[in-house]
Amino acid sequence: MGGFEKFIIEECRQLKLMGYHLIVCFSVKPICQDYINDLKSIGGECRVIPFKSHFQHYLAMRKLIKQYHTIAIHTNFSSCGFSAILAAISCRVKYRIATQHCLPSLNTFKSRIIYNMENLICTKYLCVSQASTDAMCNGLWWGKRKVVTEYLGVEDFFYDKREMISKYALPVDKIKIANVAYHNPIKGVDVLLKAVDILVHKKQIVNFQIVQIGGGQNPEQTDALHQLETQLHISNYIRWIGVIDTVPELLSACDIYCQPSRSEGISLSIMEASLANIPTIGTRVGGIVESVRDGATGILIDKENTQQLADAMEYLINSKSLRIQMGKVAGNHARQKFQLRSNVTNLLHHYGINM
């Protein structure tokens, strides 16, 4: 179960405490059955509404909304969010919220039309980072006051490092560098592999292992990364974990976190790495610059810059004291800024609900 799913579960829990009922709608059934079970166990409800057309989706959402005394509708990650919001308007739903999780691109006239129309019919447009908010407002022609930043959050945790190293059979005598990402090129896993090539073959640094957590939504993307790994002759330095539900455990076993994304709204994995008290090397894109304080909780680098990434990894590999120092600051920073319960409570204010 990912960080966002845990955020929704906490939202459901808080709503139930206030006497409200959360219905989570999907266009396809979620892969993680634990997520569905956890939602149901705390009074939530899951509905699968396949998307066939905007008109069909509008009718389906309108029918669902009219079955309940619906006070708010909130769309996430949804290409069909526009029709859902229109259905809410037709049923006079008071609070209509959309959340932008990625760094929006409003470089074309068409994209500006789409975002402006969506913002027009919402009562609030939430962005998960200030960088996303700024990008959105720069492309809007009206309604900029509706756009606000609401950070996501992660639940605090603690796992014994030695126990986690043993549990996942990680090398005791090597620095473990974690990366949590799908294998989409936007996440920059290929950049990480090329930086490993520099570390091993140019800098002669070999006392480390990359722990890559995630998978390919498209198998061809994963195959391309494995081919690159073979071409660079770095297979001995990469451990491919795949998609798992126990990311915090693995992060607790590692020493450094690396997020070389080409674009990013904000990274829940960086928040979790910080709670594991390890420093992050991240690119200066989107919300990463808000979750990593350069020189304090980690190191920021330019995107696509494999040399900077290799240099930053070398710097932290060679300094245990700095890793520990940055990790402690990172943990405190995450607990203050990205606390799950308080950030969910902030979200509920946009539904007209005050805890």
Residue ranges and their predicted role:
Residues 1-55, 219:
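N-terminal strand-loop element at the rim of the active site
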Residues 294-295, 299-306, 315-320:
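Conserved acidic donor-binding segment of nucleotide-sugar-dependent glycosyltransferases
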Residues 279-282, 292:
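Short hydrophobic beta-strand element within catalytic cores of glycosyltransferases
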Residues 171-187, 193-196, 211:
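Conserved donor-binding/catalytic core segment of Leloir-type glycosyltransferases
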Residues 308, 315, 322-337, 343-349:
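A short, well-ordered alpha-helix in the C-terminal region of glycosyltransferases
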Residues 243, 262:
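Aromatic "clamp/platform" in nucleotide-sugar-dependent glycosyltransferases that forms part
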Residues 53-55, 134-138, 146, 151-173:
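Acidic anion/phosphate-binding donor-loop and adjacent secondary structure
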